[in-house]
């Protein structure tokens, strides 16, 4: 649960995925709050995860980004499996809306009332 500076809830979300989970939590939160993505955009966006000295990249990440990481010394690898899964609901108090997103990598849905 994320609150605004007045203590009002503005976002409820969660990301699963073992060792990816803390990275996924930050990824989604950063995408929504700092890059103004919708919950669906944030949860659906391609993921990268550094594990065992390898940047494991979902195949939707461009070759240009992969090559750029390699150029500065990172070991990179495209993977077939996905990183985590999650759901989120953003609370738009101004318009009285709940804006949900659910990860297409897993089954599930975002539901609020």
Language-model features: locations:
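Terminal-appendage/accessory-domain detector
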Residues: 37-38, 54, 64-113
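Proteins synthesized as precursors that undergo proteolytic processing into mature forms
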Residues: 1-79
């Amino acid at each position: 649960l994320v609150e605004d500076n007045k203590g009002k809830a503005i976002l409820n979300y969660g990301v699963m995925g073992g060792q990816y989970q803390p990275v996924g939590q930050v990824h989604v939160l950063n995408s929504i709050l700092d890059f103004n993505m919708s919950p669906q955009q944030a949860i659906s966006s391609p993921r990268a995860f550094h594990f065992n000295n390898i940047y494991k990249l979902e195949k939707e990440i461009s070759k240009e980004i992969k090559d750029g990481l390699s150029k500065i010394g990172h070991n990179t690898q495209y993977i077939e499996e996905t990183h985590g899964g999650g759901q989120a609901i953003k609370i738009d108090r101004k318009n009285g809306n709940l804006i949900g997103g659910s990860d297409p990598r897993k089954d599930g849905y975002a539901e609020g009332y």
